[in-house]
Amino acid sequence: MADKVIALACAAGMSTSLLVSKMQKAAAENGKDYEIFAKSTADIDNMLAGTGSPKPDVLLLGPQVAFMKGEVAKKAEIAGVPMDVIKMQDYGMMRGDKVLAAAENLMN
């Protein structure tokens, strides 16, 4: 079982799949055992409840759904899950190491 679970949410859950791969690679290179996955924003309620996938230790929104931050932040707070929006530059450049570091900062 993974030490930490990092969930990413975007419009369809597909555009973040490459970023997830890069984050997994960065985690492995640093000896971290994280489960990292991406889903659609439609799955946020289930993710925060741990239904259908492990409850995340942190939730990151893709920049294309940043407008949802206020709504999601309320739900995440109730669930006890820190969340934030991925920086557009890191997302656009697919900087898995930077996004992983941001997730780790939120978990600490």
UniProtKB/Swiss-Prot annotation:
* Pfam families per record: PTS_IIB
Q: Keyword Transcription: yes or no?
A: no
Q: What is its EC class?
A: transferase
Which residues are the signal sequence here? none
Name of the protein this chain belongs to: PTS system galactose-specific EIIB component
Report the InterPro entries cross-referenced here.
PTS_EIIB-like_sf (IPR036095), PTS_EIIB_2/3 (IPR003501), PTS_EIIB_3 (IPR013012), PTS_sugar-specific_EIIB (IPR051819)
The active site annotation covers C10
Source organism per entry reads: Lactococcus lactis subsp. cremoris (strain MG1363)
Record's keyword terms, sorted: Kinase, Phosphoprotein, Phosphotransferase system, Sugar transport, Transferase, Transport
Q: Which residues carry this modification: Phosphocysteine?
A: C10
Classification via PANTHER family: PTS SYSTEM N,N'-DIACETYLCHITOBIOSE-SPECIFIC EIIB COMPONENT
Annotated GO biological processes are: phosphoenolpyruvate-dependent sugar phosphotransferase system
Q: Which residues form the PTS EIIB type-3 domain?
A: 3-108
> What does its record list under induction?
Induced by growth on galactose.
SUPFAM superfamilies registered for this protein in UniProt? PTS system IIB component-like
The EC code for this enzyme is 2.7.1.204
Function comment: The phosphoenolpyruvate-dependent sugar phosphotransferase system (sugar PTS), a major carbohydrate active transport system, catalyzes the phosphorylation of incoming sugar substrates concomitantly with their translocation across the cell membrane. Involved in galactose transport with PtcA and Lmg_0963.
Domain remark from Swiss-Prot or TrEMBL: The PTS EIIB type-3 domain is phosphorylated by phospho-EIIA on a cysteinyl residue. Then, it transfers the phosphoryl group to the sugar substrate concomitantly with the sugar uptake processed by the PTS EIIC type-3 domain.
GO MF? kinase activity; protein-N(PI)-phosphohistidine-sugar phosphotransferase activity
Provide the catalytic activity annotation. Answer: N(pros)-phospho-L-histidyl-[protein] + D-galactose(out) = D-galactose 6-phosphate(in) + L-histidyl-[protein]
- Top-rank taxon, per record: Bacteria
